[in-house]
Structures are given as structure tokens and as C-alpha cells.
Curated annotation (Swiss-Prot):
It is found in: Cytoplasm. This is tRNA(Met) cytidine acetate ligase. It is an enzyme of class 6 (ligase). InterPro entries: Rossmann-like_a/b/a_fold (IPR014729), tRNA(Met)_cyd_acetate_ligase (IPR008513). Keywords: ATP-binding, Cytoplasm, Ligase, Nucleotide-binding, RNA-binding, tRNA processing, tRNA-binding. Catalyzes the formation of N(4)-acetylcytidine (ac(4)C) at the wobble position of elongator tRNA(Met), using acetate and ATP as substrates. First activates an acetate ion to form acetyladenylate (Ac-AMP) and then transfers the acetyl group to tRNA to form ac(4)C34. The keyword RNA-binding applies.
């Protein structure tokens, strides 16, 4: 069996994602479609609108054969680290190819990645935004800048892939959904951005939402609790007001001095949005601040995140019979640990950061995210 891989968030899974899943299989004629998916906390520093188990099940119902969780210590990082974590997992699973969406798939990402490889160390620090440092280095090396989010992520996939001993085939395809910044759903459209889908769901605009998401996603959004940052604001505010500022300074992605600003603004802010707007300055993007806020909420220190990134692992969230057969084929040669459930030892050691992240999410979601959870086993028929 041969496998194609996708690196995803599915926040939530919409028609553009279903198109991506089906195109991945059709382009590669792969026997197994493997999805690496962020857990309950996402790359833009925010909670997933639906929990990871619901989103994994939706993926299996819409074309995935195997869903692997991208650990929180990669899932909540800037693009280059998010990409590295996902590429590592797909490579470990012996994927032949990786398919991903880009705004401009015609770009020669391989040439750009090769040209800038020697400069990577110059944009892996947190003193300025990743995008700013990245584009400065890319402009100096190639004369090209990448401004679209998925073009930048595509570049990062190429950069991560070329560090592998056996690089995979990378296949960028044109995104079918609207641009991420688009916040409205166009009339008579079957595709919408993730931002527009989330806003419609949170506003309970079901009429606008129904045409742009699969039926099972629509059911999940209309019947389950939907999470947003405002739900977690009291917990974040408590952390910032009670944790010693020296400890706050150790949180992942925290820039020097930002911990004092965050603590001061937490004294007066009444909502999460109010807090972020008060902390915002020209030096930091909203996404960067949300990632720091996520690290503060989950008490993720830079030291423990960097240590964990050196010990990636394969956490199975679900599979179809094809996915199960593929796992059986490769499991004896896996270079990374494979986990299907969390026990006491894993909770305290190897998977402790993901357990912590899930436990905080569970405060609002109300559903166990790790303990007593078994991977989904879905014999799915795609209509």
C-alpha cells in the first residue's frame, strides 16, 4: 500500500477540505489517505471550534483513512515549526507524497526553499514576527516575497521536506475555498473560508452555513458546544494575574518585556478581545499574541516545548479499515513512538503537554479529550 499525506486543522471541516481530501487521492492514486491534524489548539493561537475527536471523525467520514494528531508543541507554532512537525510525522509513516493547498501552486517552492536553506537560522527567533523575518530573508536570497498564508506554509513544507533523508513528493494544488481573510459566505457558493464558516456557526447563521459544509459537519456544528477564545478568558486572566511575572517570561514565544505588558493589561481588560487589543502594538501581530496567550493559558514554557519538539510521536485519533491495514504494514518500521491511548505513565511523561492542553480545553468542552478515549474505527462509505 502507498499513502498520501495531508497536514490540516479542519476548524471545522468544510467543502474546500473535502475537495482537498478527494483531490489528494485522485492525484496520487494512493491506497491510503493519511491526515495529520492539529488537536484542540491551533496554529493561529486559538481553540478549535470543535474538539479533536469530532474533527477526526469528520475527516474519516469525508475521505481520510488515518488521522494522526499533530502535538500541541508543533500545532501552536509559527509556520516553519508547524510544517516541520507535520512533515516529520508523514515521513515517519512512510508517505510517498504530500498534497496541500496554496494560493499560487504554480510557484517554484522547491527553488525558493533551496535558495533560502542557508539562511533559516536568521528567521527562527521570536524577536520579530516570523513572517517579517522570513520574507526579509527570502527577498534577500531570491527577490521573491510570499504574502499569502498558504503560500508561506507551502514554502515551509518544502523547506522541512528537503531536510529529510528521503524527501517525499510534494504536490501543491489550488485552494477551492475563499481567502482566509474573507469573513462572509457568498450567496450561491459551495465554498467559503474557514473564518467565514466559523463566524456563521458562532452567529448561528445556519442558512448561510449549510451549503458550504458537508452534512455531517453541519450536524456537528448545530448540535455540539462550539468553543471560542472568550470561553477561556477567565482562566487566562487568572493565570496572568497570579503567576509570577518571572515565570510568565519563560512561556513559549514570549518576547522580552511582553510578559509585563500582558500582566498589566490583564488587570483592566474585561474580555479576551479587549485584552488582545490593549496588548497589541506594531511589534506583534494578533496571531503572535494569541499564540503567546495560548502558551500562557496552557503554561507551556519555551524549554519544555523545545524539549518536546525533539521527541515527536504518532498519536492515532482514528482510522478506517484501509488506515488500519496501512498501520499494520508500517508499524514495525516506525522511527517514532505510536500511541493509540493515554495511560497514567504517558499522561505524566511522553504525552504530558498534549494531556495538559486537552484538559484545559475540556474545562469548556466538557468531554474527555485523552483519558479513556480510543481511536475512531469507521467503516465509511463516501457518497
Amino acid at each position: 500500500m502507498q499513502a498520501v499525506g495531508l497536514i490540516t486543522e479542519y476548524n471545522p471541516l468544510h467543502n474546500g477540505h473535502r475537495y482537498h481530501l478527494r483531490q489528494a487521492q485522485q492525484l496520487t492514486n494512493a491506497d491510503c489517505v493519511i491526515v495529520v491534524m492539529s488537536g484542540d489548539w491551533l496554529q493561529r493561537g486559538e481553540p478549535a471550534i470543535l474538539d479533536k475527536w469530532t474533527r477526526a471523525k469528520l475527516a474519516l467520514e469525508n475521505g481520510a483513512d488515518l488521522v494522526i494528531e499533530l502535538p500541541v508543541f508543533f500545532a501552536t507554532q509559527p509556520a516553519h515549526l508547524f510544517a516541520r512537525g507535520g512533515i516529520e510525522l508523514l515521513s515517519a509513516l512512510d508517505c510517498t507524497s504530500v498534497v496541500f493547498g496554496a494560493e499560487h501552486p504554480e510557484l517554484d517552492f522547491q527553488r525558493l526553499a533551496t535558495a533560502i536553506a542557508a539562511r533559516q537560522g536568521s528567521f527562527t527567533h521570536y524577536n520579530a514576527t516570523f513572517a517579517t523575518q522570513f520574507n526579509a530573508a527570502l527577498q534577500a536570497a531570491t527577490g521573491v516575497t510570499l504574502t499569502a498564508a498558504n503560500d508561506m506554509l507551502s514554502f515551509c513544507y518544502y523547506a522541512a521536506n528537503q531536510t529529510l533523508a528521503h524527501p517525499m513528493q510534494l504536490l501543491p494544488i489550488k485552494r477551492r475555498q475563499a481567502d482566509h481573510a474573507t469573513t462572509t459566505i457568498a450567496a450561491d457558493s459551495r465554498y467559503a473560508s474557514g473564518t467565514a464558516v466559523r463566524q456563521a456557526a458562532l452567529a448561528q447563521d445556519w442558512a448561510a452555513l449549510k451549503p458550504v459544509v458537508p452534512a455531517d459537519t453541519f450536524t456537528a456544528l448545530t448540535t455540539q458546544r462550539l468553543q471560542r477564545w472568550s470561553d477561556f478568558w477567565p482562566f487566562l486572566q487568572y493565570q496572568l494575574l497570579t503567576v509570577d511575572v518571572a515565570r510568565s517570561g519563560q512561556y513559549d514565544q514570549m518576547a522580552e518585556g511582553l510578559e509585563y505588558r500582558m500582566q498589566a493589561m490583564a488587570q483592566h481588560a474585561t474580555t479576551f478581545d479587549d485584552f488582545i487589543h490593549q496588548v497589541k502594538s506594531k511589534r506583534y501581530t494578533y496571531t503572535r499574541l494569541q499564540r503567546v496567550a495560548t502558551a500562557a493559558l496552557l503554561q507551556l514554557t519555551q524549554a519544555e516545548v523545545q524539549k518536546a519538539q525533539a521527541h515527536n510521536y504518532l498519536r492515532v485519533l482514528g482510522f478506517t479499515p484501509k488506515g488500519q491495514a496501512y498501520l499494520h504494514q508500517v508499524k514495525k518500521q516506525l522511527p517514532l513512538p505510536l500511541y493509540t491511548k493515554i495511560n497514567q505513565d504517558l499522561r505524566q511523561h511522553a504525552l504530558n503537554l498534549d494531556y495538559r492542553a486537552g484538559r484545559v480545553y475540556q474545562l469548556i468542552n466538557g468531554q474527555s479529550q485523552d483519558l479513556y478515549r480510543q481511536p475512531w474505527r469507521l467503516p465509511v462509505t463516501i457518497g
